[in-house]
């Protein structure tokens, strides 16, 4: 992903939620998408640059390739993908694996078991909202934000469960994840 990208900003919430069911993040920082890339409205979010993730079930490397501020019309470099990860991106971030001919971000590769790109959350739900307000909304299962973020997190979790052979059982066997698993591949 990239910090400027509004769709990356949207997808980080469900991705962090999904991965947190399997392990622990440290060093997540607050950031926002470039307002100029979203009709002047930022999407406040979490960034993977400088963070680490540990899990006994799955490995995760989150890359933010560029920041959210242009200098002389160019975003600043952040993370460089290792050669093996760059090769996967070059191979699979194009048709027939993803819809846009030029590829898309965010892009998630599930260890040879699946690929997802784009955001599963409607940006109108999060535009201009503070991270603390978004977190409060996610915690309220009756809110539209929670339904969207948790619903997308359940899809991501179901895809991760394919990689982990449905471990841990309490995560992969939950009703929300099982319902999401039925939607994979559709």
Q: Which residues does each predicted region cover?
A:
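Short pre-active-site segment immediately N-terminal to redox-active cysteine/selenocysteine motifs
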Residues: 3-4
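Cell wall/extracellular polymer interaction/catalysis modules
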Residues: 7
């Amino acid at each position: 992903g990239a910090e400027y990208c509004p769709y990356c900003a949207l997808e980080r919430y469900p991705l962090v939620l999904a991965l947190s069911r399997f392990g622990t993040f440290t060093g997540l920082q607050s950031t926002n998408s470039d307002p100029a890339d979203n009709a002047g409205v930022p999407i406040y979010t979490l960034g993977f640059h400088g963070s680490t993730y540990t899990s006994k079930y799955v490995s995760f490397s989150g890359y933010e390739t560029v920041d959210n501020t242009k200098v002389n019309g160019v975003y600043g470099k952040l993370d460089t993908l290792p050669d093996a990860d760059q090769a996967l991106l070059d191979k699979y971030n194009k048709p027939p694996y993803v819809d846009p001919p030029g590829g898309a971000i965010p892009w998630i590769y599930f260890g040879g078991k699946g690929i997802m790109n784009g955001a599963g959350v409607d940006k109108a739900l999060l535009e201009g909202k503070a991270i603390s307000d978004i977190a409060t909304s996610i915690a309220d299962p009756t809110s539209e934000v929670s339904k969207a973020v948790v619903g997308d997190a359940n899809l991501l979790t179901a895809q991760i469960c394919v990689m982990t052979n449905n471990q841990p059982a309490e995560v992969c066997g939950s009703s929300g994840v099982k319902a999401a698993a039925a939607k994979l591949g559709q």
